[in-house]
C-alpha cells in the first residue's frame, strides 16, 4: 500500500510538471510578440492640409514628416509589443491628428501612412515583406487612399494592357505584393462599380530587384505617390 501511495504521488507530481509546461507553452503561443525589442518603421504622410507631423509609438517620438507626401527612411526602434499606440501629432505639440493601436512584432518591418483630414484622418499600418523579387523583377503593392469621386468605390489596379495586378481594393486597404517587369511606368486604376471609367496614371520607372508601394491618393483628383521600400 505504501508503494502504491508513493507511486501515485510520483504520478501526481509528473502530471503537475506536465500541466505547468503546457501552460507556459500556451502563454508563449498566445503571445508571440515581445515588448521593447527592435523593429523598423517607415512613415508616410499623404494627408492633405495636415501640416507637418510628428510620429509617435507610445510616448516615444520616432520621426517627423512633412505634409507634402513625404516618406521617411526605415527607422529602427525598440517599440515592439501588443496594442502599441501609434500617433501622428501636429509637429512640436501634443495635439493628436490621428491615433490607432497595432500589434508590432519584433524584428519586423512596418509602413505607417497618415491620410484623411479632421474626423476622417486615419492611419494605415502594414507589415512589409522585404524578401527579394525574382532576378530582373520589381515587387510592388498598391494602396487605395483616394477619396476623389473618380475612385470612390473599390478599385482594380492593372497594367496599361489590361493585365490585372490587384483586384477589388477597398479604400484604406492595401494589396499584397506582386512581381512586375522592371521599367513599369504606367498603371490603370478602374473603379469596380464603373469599369468603363478607367484612370491612367504614371509613376517613376520601377527598377529591377527593388520593392515599392504605390499609393493612390487625392480628394479631388486621383494621383500617385511611389514609396521605395527597399
State the predicted function of each range.
Residues 5-7, 24-230:
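Intrinsically disordered, low-complexity polar regions and short flexible loop motifs
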Residues 1-26:
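Sec-dependent bacterial lipoprotein signal peptides
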Amino acid at each position: 500500500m505504501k508503494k502504491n501511495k508513493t507511486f501515485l504521488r510520483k504520478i501526481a507530481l509528473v502530471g503537475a510538471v506536465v500541466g505547468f509546461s503546457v501552460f507556459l507553452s500556451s502563454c508563449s503561443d498566445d503571445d508571440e510578440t515581445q515588448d521593447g525589442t527592435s523593429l523598423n518603421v517607415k512613415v508616410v504622410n499623404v494627408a492633405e492640409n495636415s501640416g507637418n507631423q510628428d510620429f509617435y509609438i507610445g510616448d516615444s517620438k520616432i520621426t517627423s514628416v512633412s505634409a507634402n507626401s513625404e516618406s521617411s527612411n526605415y527607422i529602427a526602434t525598440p517599440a515592439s509589443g501588443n496594442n502599441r499606440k501609434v500617433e501622428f501629432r501636429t509637429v512640436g505639440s501634443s495635439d493628436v491628428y490621428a491615433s490607432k493601436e497595432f500589434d508590432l512584432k519584433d524584428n519586423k518591418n512596418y509602413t505607417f501612412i497618415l491620410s484623411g483630414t479632421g474626423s476622417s484622418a486615419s492611419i494605415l499600418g502594414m507589415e512589409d515583406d522585404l524578401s527579394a523579387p525574382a532576378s530582373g523583377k520589381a515587387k510592388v503593392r498598391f494602396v487605395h487612399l483616394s477619396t476623389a469621386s473618380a475612385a470612390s468605390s473599390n478599385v482594380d489596379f492593372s497594367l496599361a494592357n489590361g493585365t490585372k495586378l490587384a483586384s477589388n481594393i477597398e479604400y484604406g486597404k492595401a494589396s499584397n505584393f506582386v512581381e512586375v517587369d522592371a521599367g513599369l511606368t504606367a498603371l490603370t486604376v478602374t473603379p469596380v462599380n464603373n469599369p468603363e471609367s478607367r484612370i491612367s496614371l504614371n509613376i517613376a520607372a520601377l527598377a529591377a530587384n527593388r520593392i515599392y508601394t504605390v499609393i493612390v491618393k487625392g480628394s479631388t483628383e486621383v494621383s500617385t505617390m511611389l514609396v521605395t521600400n527597399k
